């Protein structure tokens, strides 16, 4: 059994502090390197995120931005790590899940590794796949999912994707993975979602 985890808003709550800071850094980067004002930079950032699943993809495709330079300057660990909120239930959950656990994130590798360490759960993961490891093709692109399955020689039917993004799970389901949507308070469950959970710790119930 293979458990594939997203990072932000799945293993930790990124929306309160981490995401707003990253968004500000991305906007500042666009202002400096594309020479546009703040309103235009915000529009571009949001447009590319909506269209491609990551602002970076649009900047690379349409403006020739160096992806590594962008990721390094928009994910400063000295600013972001103090904003990461830890939850002991996450480690408790990972300990009780049988099989391998890996990370598949649209974040850069240095950020993923640092956040897992900050959360105290890095030892649970046998592999980590950040954007650099999947050729900068972010979810919901199928490339990242296929890369994980191929490199780990895992079967889709024996693999589980745990995500807060329904769009990403749509791709995972199309590829044959089992899908778990972490969506607190969400009443609906789309056909491509096998399980909808309010809390990550509810995963343990799926293997009892």
Where are these regions (language model features)?
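Hydrophobic residues in well-ordered beta-strands that form the structural core
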Residues: 13, 103-105, 181
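Asp-based, Mg2+/Mn2+-dependent phosphohydrolase catalytic module
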Residues: 1, 91, 95, 108-208
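Conserved residues at beta->alpha junctions
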Residues: 9, 103-106, 163
């Amino acid at each position: 059994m293979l458990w594939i985890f997203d990072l932000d808003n799945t293993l930790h709550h990124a929306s309160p502090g981490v995401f707003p800071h990253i968004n500000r850094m991305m906007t500042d980067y666009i202002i400096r390197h594309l020479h546009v004002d703040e309103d235009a930079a915000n529009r571009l950032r949001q447009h590319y995120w909506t269209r491609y699943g990551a602002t970076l993809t649009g900047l690379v495709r349409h403006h020739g931005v160096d992806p590594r330079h962008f990721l390094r300057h928009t994910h400063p660990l000295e600013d972001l790590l103090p904003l990461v909120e830890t939850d002991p239930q996450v480690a408790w959950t990972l300990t009780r899940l049988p099989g391998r656990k890996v990370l598949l994130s649209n974040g850069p590798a240095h950020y993923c590794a640092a956040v897992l360490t900050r959360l105290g759960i890095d030892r649970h993961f046998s592999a980590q796949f950040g954007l650099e490891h999947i050729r900068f093709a972010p979810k919901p692109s199928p490339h990242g999912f296929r890369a994980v399955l191929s490199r780990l020689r895992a079967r889709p039917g024996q693999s589980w994707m745990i995500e807060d993004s329904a769009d990403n799970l749509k791709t995972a389901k199309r590829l044959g993975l089992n899908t778990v949507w972490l969506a607190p308070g969400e009443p609906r469950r789309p056909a491509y979602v096998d399980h909808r959970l309010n809390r990550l710790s509810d995963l343990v119930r799926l293997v009892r």
